Amino acid sequence: MLARRPRDPLQALRRRGQELKLQVDSLVTESQLTGALEPSKRREIYQRCIQLKQAVDENKNTLQKLNKADEAAPVGNYEQRKEEEHSLLEKLACQLQELAVSISRKDALKVEAHSDKEEDDTTEDDEEETGGEEEESEGDGEGKQEQASPKQAETETVTYIALGDFAAQQTGDLTFKKGDVLHIIEKKPDGWWLAKDAEGVEGLIPRTYLEPYNKEDKLESSEGSEEGGEEDGEEDVEVVDETADGAQVKQRTDSHWSAVRKAISEQINTVDVLATMGAIPAGFRPSTLSQLLDEAGNQFRASYFLQPELTTSQLAFRDLTWDAKAGTIMSRPSRVSLILTLWSCKMIPLPGTSIQVLSRHIRLCLFDGSKVLSNIHTVRAVWQPKKPKTWTFSPQVTGILPCLLDGDCFIRSNSSTPDLGILFELGISYIRNSTGERGELSCGWVFLKLFDASGVPIPAKTYELFLNGGTPYEKGVEVDPSVSRRAQGSVFRQMISVRRQPQLLVKLRSLNRRSRAMLSLLPETLVGSMCSAHLLIFYRQILGDVLLRDRTNLQSADLISHPVLATFPLLLEQPDVMDALRSSWSEKESTLKRAEKRDKELLKAEFLLVYHDCVLPLLHSTLLPPFRWAEEETEAARWKAIADFLKQSRENEGSLKALLSPDGVHKPFDLSEQTFDFLGEIRKNSG
């Protein structure tokens, strides 16, 4: 028998919230005696703390999904009550997190004290064993010496010199200045070594700031310095050997100082230099998807996938067919057709002050684990100075939301590969303050498979995805190794550090009837913004009219005079002009009557008029600077030029006056503005 749905879900959640509050208050009161409790009791409190935190998070998730329509009877001040409950749950979550951190710190201090005591005991035992060894036979003594020598080599203190200044980032780090001599106590495989300075202060330091120290080399001539450099290179090789066990994916971040010296003579990759200098986390890489966009021409751009594809015989269109009964292009279902919402990115590491971030964004595409199967779609993120590690999407703006900021994306694919999924790559565009050099870095990536091992589509829900460092072709690389480094040695720290890992929140939404019908008019493979999907459909319908309905000879490959078909693909690479078209069409659509909106031919005719009146003048105006990604001044100048043009057109009821004005200067006419060469624009058949 099916369980009955609660009649008052909000009231039930509020009741559950009060129960959780009582449990949290009781746990906090009990924890006040933590200092006098046994370790087993503290562990029990910590486990209860984690369980309560999970229960609070579940309540928060359920609360977010609640709507007023879920209530069986009207509820007064619904939104206010919901907000109050959300605030209570947030407060409880903070209390539990603080309590967990407090307990874990106390345990960590006890573990460290216990370790010191064990080391003292071990020293005494070693002295006793040494005395006993002298009484043993000579052969046994030699055997024990052979066994002890590797251990002695590992714990032997090595002297290094600091190559730069380092300020402690967290408790336990050791602050030092350039030129300080440091004694290495323990070399850890994660790259953070335990060291002691000249004053005897111990702490963790990054090995990328160190170089072996040799007093004789300091007194020798420049020739001796060069020999010292060669010895340093050998030491770098030893470092690689030490970290090779279980850390092979981190090879790109090994021998950092050697890479810097090499960069001076061989001009190695800028990213390696930035990582060596500590300007970026070790897991950052040059953006893979950005390089594909730059180097592959048109192959991974939306304009390429928007064009029709020919059949194997090259005599017809494979994905653009005419529906004579409906009088328009035929809808085409695909294996994957869904809407994806980008919610937020959390705990994204910050780059250093030596580089200026120009843009934070996500690039996404369809991927099978080895190759990209669709266009690469880009969504720009926004952030607040108070929360610089959190990126959000679809901000509230005055007027229409720019399609570049729209976090709602449609995903379509007809690929039959069982490993089909969505590849997300977080990136930043930057400029180096010292050299003015520009570039794009990947801040992490994640691959979400769309089908399980049985070939069943994954459910439509919200996914919390933890990011990987490196490139999509590297495995096991962390975005910021310092996060997991802090979690070593304590189960409690490991559990808390999970929430500090860089992560991406996305939601997969299933389609309703209207959305499915709309997206089925798009190409079988395409990723794009939902806010511009209706404009892409207009283009495909006009493309079908021209290529399938109006051509007298379907075998003719002559050039076609059609400015919309010739120029519309340019809009996909100029999102601000696409926004101008969206705005103009929205204003025009608001003036149409309901009966007119149902007339498809009338809508297409009106769309063509709006396009001619808005887009064509902007594309060929000299007042509009060329589009350049992540150049703030250029983007601002383009926005101003577009806004001024739209304002004039609105005031003069059209763009004719602006076009005929002596102030309006346009580029020389080119035949490509009117000519549509559909064979030149056709996608090559992948089969």
Swiss-Prot record:
GO terms for cellular component: adherens junction; bicellular tight junction; cell-cell junction; ciliary base; ciliary transition zone; cilium; cytoplasm; cytoskeleton. PROSITE patterns: SH3. Keywords: Cell junction, Cell projection, Cilium, Cilium biogenesis/degradation, Coiled coil, Cytoplasm, Cytoskeleton, Differentiation, Phosphoprotein, SH3 domain, Spermatogenesis, Tight junction. Disulfide bonds: none annotated. Together with BCAR1 it may play a role in the control of epithelial cell polarity. Involved in the organization of apical junctions in kidney cells, together with NPHP4 and RPGRIP1L/NPHP8. Does not seem to be strictly required for ciliogenesis. Seems to help to recruit PTK2B/PYK2 to cell matrix adhesions, thereby initiating phosphorylation of PTK2B/PYK2 and PTK2B/PYK2-dependent signaling. May play a role in the regulation of intraflagellar transport (IFT) during cilia assembly. Required for normal retina development. Pfam families: SH3_1. This is Nephrocystin-1. Interacts with INVS and NPHP3. Interacts with Crk-associated substrate BCAR1. Interacts with NPHP4. Interacts with PTK2B/PYK2 and tensin. Interacts with AHI1 and TNK2. Interacts with NPHP4 in a complex containing NPHP1, NPHP4 and RPGRIP1L/NPHP8. Interacts with IQCB1; the interaction likely requires additional interactors. Interacts (via SH3 domain) with PKD1. Interacts with KIF7. Interacts with ANKS3. Interacts with SPATA7. Interacts with FLNA. Residues 118-140, 223-237 have a biased composition (Acidic residues).
